[in-house]
Amino acid sequence: AGETYRYFCWAVKDENDPYSFEPTVVQENLPKKRAELEEQYGITIKYIINDAQDWAAKVMEASLAGTPITDILHGGGPFAMLNIYNFSSTGGRLLLQLDEYSDYADFSDPSWWRTELQQSGYFNGHQYFAVPNVIGIEHVALNQVCIFNKSLLESAGYPADKLYEMNQSGEWTWDKFYEVAISCTNPDTGTIGVNVGDSFSLIHSLFSSAGARAVTSETKDGATEVTFTPNTPEALEAWDFFIKLGQAGAVDYRHASGDVEIFLSGNVGMICTYFNRVINIASSKRHPEYGILFPPKQEVEDEYTSDVNWFTPYAAMSQISNPAGAVQLLSLYCAPLYSAEDERNQASVEAELMQ
């Protein structure tokens, strides 16, 4: 009782308004959860603002110096995990091993935690990161989709109804995708077939549909080996198709989170990216009429894949005053608002899709 637990999230710029980046259902309910936990345990949850461009370096350098600025760390995304774990070659010494605190926290319940994805948070046999389940619109927000400009594709001979029919019948393949991308590429009018999406989402979707993995990991005798595997036979098939598109002049290589603005320009036929970009596109008053398809599959007989290559990892720092309390609070505060079986999950999805 009486303790203050510090919580760092890269998106928080104002400690008095730390929820603005969250989905609506979280914005509405997380403050209540925070207040309930503070009252129940007699603690204070203090948000640490991010005032640095390289937030991970800020947090980890402070811990490296022996003066951690936070107890609980929002890990940003999977891209940051390895750097956080092995910052300055520390091999996890700046983080707590969550599995060592099983008397205080349980991260093994799939009703609350993404246990399969959590495997990526294990290094050398110990768990350093917890990955909570998602709720509401987040269930589909990070799935990969293909968003298309209806007007551009129709003028190229591919009306929306025809595309939806291909999608539904299982004929939306790499070959059809290539055909459509070429058809709506016109250097004279400045239109181009497909944008690569946020952080080259297109190649991620091609990898997924080909059954390739860019990174693989294997743990033997308590030691984890992570291998970069962009050159397997399956991966090379994806690269070859991507290069073929590029050689035909049908690829717009601009990428990063500005992919929404790129699509809103109206001169890009398709964009492979996260489903949550649809929310941003729809909220714009100047958006072109758009449709949504699965990312293309390699062959007709294959299944469609809409992979989720993003999740939110959480960690607790070492060298803090109450490590057991921090891990326990992480398991309570960073867990989703509702369990996977809670009917409020589906209700919140429907409510947010209607907004």
Kindly give the residue locations of the regions a language model identified.
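Short helix-initiation/N-cap motifs at beta->coil->alpha
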Residues: 50-58, 169-176, 252-264
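Paired acidic/hydrophobic, glycine-rich loop segments that form the ligand-binding mouth/hinge
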Residues: 70-74, 269-274
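Short, solvent-exposed loop/beta-turn-alpha elements that line the ligand-binding surface or hinge
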Residues: 103-112, 155, 167-169, 213-237, ...
